[in-house]
Amino acid sequence: MPTVEVFNKEGKKVEDIELSEKVFGAKISESALHQVVVAQLANKRQGTQSAKTRTEVSGGGIKPWRQKGTGRARQGSIRAPQWIHGGVVFAPKPRDYRISIPKSMRRTAMLSALTSKVNDKEMIVLDELKIDAPKTKEIVKMLNAFEAKKALIVVAESDQNVYKSVRNIQGAAVIPANNLNVYDILKYDKFIVTKEAVSKIEEVYA
């Protein structure tokens, strides 16, 4: 079983805990990680881009001058793409970029991401993270104690005081354990998770 140290907010070691082998000691699948991250990024896209083709722009399709005898290049329509106010060639249209990923692959990717953080010594377990009132200074102090410039903080339950304390810090984010996803785990250098949140993660994936 993987063993990690538990720290307090000041960065001092409190104890050691054993993690679930199934969750934090799984075999890493780089292909699953890649496919799930690509799918997550694709699913974030709005897909609302749109432009008009030559058949959709306003104005008539009148032929600007006769075909022969003017000395100028032949033109068929004043709404052809090469004209000002003309239509767009192969104009983008609204589309759905969503990629469906099998549940088993999502699970494999999640376990791979969690295991990689343990293997790379990038997972930091906190005994608790309680703040009486929103205070960015407290979170900054904690991040400095762990030398964490880019960190994902995972809490057991959504906490407005913690959320408001973190939201103004560039390079840091907070997320409840039930919203944990592969992209966010890999995006940040440090994976800071409370002891209670670890239990929740193991409860879901063990």
UniProtKB/Swiss-Prot annotation:
GO terms for molecular function: rRNA binding; structural constituent of ribosome. The keyword rRNA-binding applies. GO terms for cellular component: ribonucleoprotein complex; ribosome. InterPro entries: Ribosomal_uL4, Ribosomal_uL4-like, Ribosomal_uL4_dom_sf. GO terms for biological process: translation. Pfam families: Ribosomal_L4. Keywords: Ribonucleoprotein, Ribosomal protein, RNA-binding, rRNA-binding. Residues 45-76 are annotated as: Disordered. Part of the 50S ribosomal subunit. HAMAP family: Ribosomal_uL4_B. One of the primary rRNA binding proteins, this protein initially binds near the 5'-end of the 23S rRNA. It is important during the early stages of 50S assembly. It makes multiple contacts with different domains of the 23S rRNA in the assembled 50S subunit and ribosome. Belongs to the universal ribosomal protein uL4 family. NCBIfam families: rplD_bact (TIGR03953). This is Large ribosomal subunit protein uL4.
